[in-house]
């Protein structure tokens, strides 16, 4: 499994941007005995359609096949898809889009006895985020240091 996906990212991002789309995430994983290169793309304002995904999949596949040296010498399956409604929050622009939205945050270590929180993102800066969470019927503001955040994604509020 490649440790550094940066050359792949740098090669395929212009292809994706050239179709007015956004590269949301990129991962290389092994499931059972098969390797997968998963690329998540989106298009604003209304999301990406299946025709664009199919076209990008072909173009990205061609770009990957032409790279020398081959960054993925072992056989793998290329999957290109939408990140869905619960898309990850990774880049700074994702965090900005998430302001006021309902999000899911997973932490490296417990904070106030919990490692997972869901709530509305009220504010953020370089050091921390402010989340409004609901505990039973009470609303509470929680400040979470960004260095403690293991993962974050948009969430659906029920």
From Swiss-Prot:
UniProt-recorded name of the protein: Ribosome maturation factor RimP
Record GO biological process: ribosomal small subunit assembly; translation
GO cellular component terms attached to this protein's record: cytosol
Gene expressing this chain: rimP
Species, as recorded: Lactobacillus delbrueckii subsp. bulgaricus (strain ATCC 11842 / DSM 20081 / BCRC 10696 / JCM 1002 / NBRC 13953 / NCIMB 11778 / NCTC 12712 / WDCM 00102 / Lb 14)
Keywords: Cytoplasm, Ribosome biogenesis
Family affiliation: Belongs to the RimP family.
Job description of the protein: Required for maturation of 30S ribosomal subunits.
Subcellular localization, as worded in the UniProt entry: Cytoplasm
Xref: SUPFAM superfamilies: YhbC-like, C-terminal domain, YhbC-like, N-terminal domain
Disulfide bridges in this chain: none
């Amino acid at each position: 499994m490649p440790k550094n996906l940066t050359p792949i990212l740098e090669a395929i991002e212009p292809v994706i941007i050239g179709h007015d789309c956004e590269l949301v995430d990129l991962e290389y994983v092994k499931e059972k005995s098969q390797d997968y290169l998963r690329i998540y793309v989106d298009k604003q304002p209304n999301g990406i359609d299946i025709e664009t995904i199919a076209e990008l999949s072909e173009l990205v596949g061609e770009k990957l096949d032409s790279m020398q040296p081959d960054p993925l010498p072992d056989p793998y399956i290329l999957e290109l898809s939408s990140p869905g409604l619960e898309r990850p929050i990774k880049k700074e622009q994702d965090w900005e889009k998430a302001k006021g939205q309902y999000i899911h945050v997973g932490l490296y270590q417990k904070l106030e006895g919990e490692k997972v929180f869901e709530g509305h993102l009220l504010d953020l800066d370089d050091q921390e985020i402010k989340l409004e969470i609901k505990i039973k019927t009470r609303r509470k503001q929680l400040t979470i240091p960004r260095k403690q955040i293991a993962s974050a994604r948009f969430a659906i509020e029920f």
